[in-house]
């Protein structure tokens, strides 16, 4: 039965999540929900590597172009919207497929955080950063003080436990009603970084600079302007650095972001990664998905 099953495709930037998501949607009668914090913004197409119109014609996409530049889109917004969409997609008899690299979005949806708006979200993020900086010994010491019989000393579960002790949860959203299959994509670091560099060059040839300049002129302080691929050009527009330096900043920040994404998914979520250059890929993914759905 497919009635409560959701596919989730995660991984670092430039690894090939979009292509796999579309293939899965075509083969499994699915609809895609974007799990990317920047693709919600209208008009920011190149720098966010947003699905093209041609790609959108191949499969139904949701949470693309749903906010203006000047509007915020929080984790709370994503969880509420994604839950609504999952329910609607399943009611249509289709398979929901979450595709994205924003780890906090995906984790919050799967684990059912009750974020309660921006204030609670900010406090939770501060606590999470503090807990993540602790050594295993320090983290588990905190857990065992509260629960000496904690069943499994696992970093992800320990952090989750301490967050729930601090913020609690509500019946409204204390956990997900859905069964998720997480599909993680990865590639050898050297290869991934080269793909990232090449993609930035491609974005430049497609008009990224003009897109960034428009954002700089119209909404430089908006949440949308804080994304990688835009903010790096602002010092160039102000005459502080060269264009070459700005492009190198985009590449460097994108590589660092990819590393952070992988760290997040490995440490905080139970993801089995597939090497996109493996001889068995993507057949191995389709086999797992078929078994999961049936």
From Swiss-Prot:
Xref: Pfam families: IPPT (PF01715)
Q: What class of enzyme is it?
A: transferase
Q: State its Enzyme Commission number(s).
A: 2.5.1.75
Q: Which reaction does it catalyse?
A: adenosine(37) in tRNA + dimethylallyl diphosphate = N(6)-dimethylallyladenosine(37) in tRNA + diphosphate
What's the encoding gene here? Answer: miaA
Species name for this entry?
Lactococcus lactis subsp. cremoris (strain SK11)
Q: Detail which positions bind ATP.
A: 11-18
Q: What is this protein called?
A: tRNA dimethylallyltransferase
UniProt keyword list:
ATP-binding, Magnesium, Nucleotide-binding, Transferase, tRNA processing
Where along this sequence does the record place binding of substrate? 13-18
The organism's lineage is: Bacteria, Bacillati, Bacillota, Bacilli, Lactobacillales
- Superkingdom classification of source: Bacteria
Role summary? Catalyzes the transfer of a dimethylallyl group onto the adenine at position 37 in tRNAs that read codons beginning with uridine, leading to the formation of N6-(dimethylallyl)adenosine (i(6)A).
Per the record, the GO terms for biological process are: tRNA modification
Cofactors (names): Mg(2+)
Region (Interaction with substrate tRNA) location: 36-39
Tell me the subunit arrangement. Answer: Monomer.
Tell me which residues are marked as the site Interaction with substrate tRNA: 102
MF annotations from Gene Ontology = ATP binding; tRNA dimethylallyltransferase activity
* Family according to the record: Belongs to the IPP transferase family.
């Amino acid at each position: 039965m497919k009635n409560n099953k959701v596919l989730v495709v995660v991984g670092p930037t430039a690894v090939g999540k979009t292509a796999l998501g579309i293939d899965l949607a075509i083969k499994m009668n699915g609809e895609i929900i974007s799990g990317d914090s920047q693709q919600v913004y209208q008009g920011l197409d190149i720098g966010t590597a947003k699905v093209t119109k041609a790609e959108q014609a191949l499969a139904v996409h949701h949470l693309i172009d749903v906010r203006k530049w000047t509007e915020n889109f929080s984790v709370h917004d994503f969880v509420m919207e994604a839950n609504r969409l999952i329910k609607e997609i399943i009611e249509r008899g289709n398979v929901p497929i979450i595709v994205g690299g924003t780890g906090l979005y995906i984790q919050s949806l799967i684990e059912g955080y009750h974020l309660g708006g921006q204030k609670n979200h900010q406090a939770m993020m501060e606590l999470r950063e503090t807990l993540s900086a602790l050594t295993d010994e320090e983290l588990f010491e905190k857990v065992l003080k509260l629960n000496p019989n904690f069943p499994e000393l696992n970093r992800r579960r320990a952090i989750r436990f301490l967050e729930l002790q601090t913020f609690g949860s509500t019946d409204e959203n204390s956990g997900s009603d859905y069964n998720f299959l997480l599909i993680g994509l990865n590639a050898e670091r050297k290869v991934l970084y080269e793909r990232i560099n090449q993609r930035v060059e491609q974005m430049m040839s497609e008009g990224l600079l003009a897109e960034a300049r428009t954002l700089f002129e119209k909404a430089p302080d908006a949440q949308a302007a804080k994304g990688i691929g835009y903010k790096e050009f602002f010092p160039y527009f102000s005459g502080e650095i060269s264009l070459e330096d700005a492009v190198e900043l985009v590449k460097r920040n994108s590589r660092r972001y990819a590393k952070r994404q992988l760290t997040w998914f490995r440490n905080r979520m139970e993801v089995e990664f597939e090497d996109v250059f493996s001889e068995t890929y993507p057949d191995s993914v389709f086999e797992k998905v078929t078994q999961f759905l049936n």
